[in-house]
A protein has these predicted regions:
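Beta-loop motif signature
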Residues: 184-237, 256-274
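A short beta-strand motif characteristic of beta-propeller blades
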Residues: 29-33, 80-85, 131
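Acidic, glycine-anchored loop motifs typical of Ca2+
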Residues: 45-56, 97-104
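Bacterial N-terminal signal peptides
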Residues: 9-17
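Sec-dependent signal peptide cleavage junction
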Residues: 16-28
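Short aromatic loop motif centered on NTY/YTY
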Residues: 89-121, 125-191
């Protein structure tokens, strides 16, 4: 009888020790709403809101030589997902947005072209990729479900602006989620350049009424853009200005007097970082 009691006590002590060891090696992380939080491999978090914490492990593989794949392999339970990229951050992050928790995998990109992947655990316990934002997760700000990050502009030259995103939930397809851009009508640029040619600036986008004609040699300000088709240009004092159309396949050309010209042939002082 004594041996049985002793055996039971030993078994209980071992079980408690194992549980404590697990707790020490697998801490439970509870991210705050809207706060990007780094998570160590082996930590646990309730990813799908079922009240149970899932253990998260990940493996990061970077190869500067390009001889092998560069990736992050996520494992949650028996589910695995590999995200490939250019140069991956050594850490994975957590972000809770409107009570939904996401794993963020960050790729530094080929040339300061960051990309953050949003991974979630669906209702069936499978890891899914909701899409990505071309921004560093550490620079992201979340306000009422809107995620704002600093992204690279796409028109004319190398510049950056804040961009807004939300994560849409498609309940018609089993609750699949998708990162969606919320375009703003105007993004600030603020670059001072010098005109190389005479440039008519229009009072309205798509209009034919000229608001201001810039002369070759004039100093002007690229005030802002919709980052798609139009750039607003002002005089050096910022008092008068008008719209200039973007042209070309890659958004680095401008349309001047109906003619498509390279942006570098229109303005001196454009910045390019690649």
């Amino acid at each position: 009888m004594k041996k049985t009691i002793v055996s039971l006590i030993l078994a209980l002590v071992m079980a408690l020790s194992f549980g404590l060891a697990q707790a020490e090696t697998s801490p439970i992380v509870e991210p705050e709403e809207g706060k990007v939080t780094p998570v160590e491999s082996g930590a646990s978090c309730d990813l799908n809101g079922d009240g149970k914490a899932e253990q998260i492990t990940y493996e990061v593989h970077n190869d500067d030589t390009g001889a092998t794949e560069t990736y992050v392999k996520l494992t949650v339970g028996d589910q695995e997902l590999k995200i490939e990229g250019w140069y991956m951050d050594e850490k994975v992050y957590l972000l809770k947005v409107q009570f939904n928790t996401y794993l963020l995998v960050f790729d530094y990109g080929p040339s300061d072209d960051p990309e953050t992947h949003f991974i979630y655990l669906d209702d069936n316990g499978k890891l899914q990729d909701a899409g990505s934002i071309l921004a560093n997760p550490n620079d992201m700000v979340v306000n009422r479900g809107i995620i704002t990050g600093s992204v690279r502009g796409t028109v004319l030259y190398t510049w950056y602006h804040d961009a807004d995103y939300m994560i849409a939930n498609n309940i018609m397809e089993g609750g699949t989620r998708h990162v969606v851009n919320l375009p703003r009508p105007f993004y600030a640029m603020g670059l001072v350049v010098k005109a190389k040619v005479d440039i008519p600036l229009y009072a309205q986008q798509g209009g034919d009424s000229v608001a201001l004609t810039v002369k070759a040699g004039d100093t002007v300000i690229l005030s802002g853009s919709d980052d798609k088709q139009w750039i607003y240009v002002t005089d050096k004092d910022g008092d008068n200005g008008g719209w200039l159309a973007v042209g070309g396949e890659y958004g680095i050309d401008l349309i001047v007097n109906g003619q498509t010209m390279s942006g570098s042939d229109v303005f001196d002082g454009l910045l390019f970082a690649d």
